Regions:
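Tryptophan-centered short beta-strand motifs
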Residues: 6-9, 43
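Short amphipathic
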Residues: 8-16
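Rieske [2Fe-2S] iron-sulfur-binding domain
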Residues: 22-125
Length: 126
C-alpha cells in the first residue's frame, strides 16, 4: 500500500454506483480506470486500457465466476485479484490502491510520476 504522502486520494464512485459482481469504467486525471467490485465486497481498481494495444478493457469480458478480465481485441486475460497477466503471462495491469470512506470509493493516484498505464512490449529474438 502507498503512504498518504505518495498518493492523492480521488473519489471514483460510491458503493451504490457499483454492486458486488459488477464493474465501472471511469476516467481519473486523464487515465481510464476499471473499478471491479468482487463478490465478497473487495474492490479492485486497475488501469482501464489493455497493455497490449491500449484497447478499453471495459469493452471486453469481465467474468466474475472465473475472476478474469478479458480484452476484446486479442483476448489477453488478467486476474481481477491482482491485475497479473494470465494470457499471456509476464504482462500486468497497473493496480491502484483503494480505500472506502463511508459509501465513497477512493483510489490512490501516485504523486511520484509513476506511469499509471503499463505497456507490454514483445522482445524479438536477434
Amino acid at each position: 500500500m502507498s503512504s498518504d504522502e505518495a498518493v492523492k486520494w480521488v473519489k471514483v464512485a460510491t458503493l451504490d454506483d457499483i454492486w458486488e459482481g459488477d464493474f465501472l469504467d471511469v476516467e481519473v486525471e486523464g487515465e481510464e480506470v476499471i473499478v471491479v467490485h468482487l463478490r465478497g465486497g473487495e474492490i479492485r481498481c486497475f488501469q482501464g486500457m489493455c497493455p497490449h494495444q491500449e484497447i478499453l478493457l471495459a469493452d471486453g469480458k469481465v467474468d466474475f465466476d472465473a475472476g478474469i478480465i478479458t480484452c476484446s481485441a486479442h483476448e489477453w486475460q488478467f486476474s481481477m485479484e491482482d491485475g497479473s497477466g494470465l494470457n499471456p503471462r509476464g504482462c500486468k495491469l497497473f493496480r491502484y490502491d483503494v480505500r472506502k470512506a463511508g459509501e465513497d470509493i477512493l483510489i490512490g493516484v501516485p504523486l511520484d510520476g509513476r506511469l499509471r498505464r503499463l505497456r507490454h512490449h514483445f522482445q524479438q529474438d536477434a
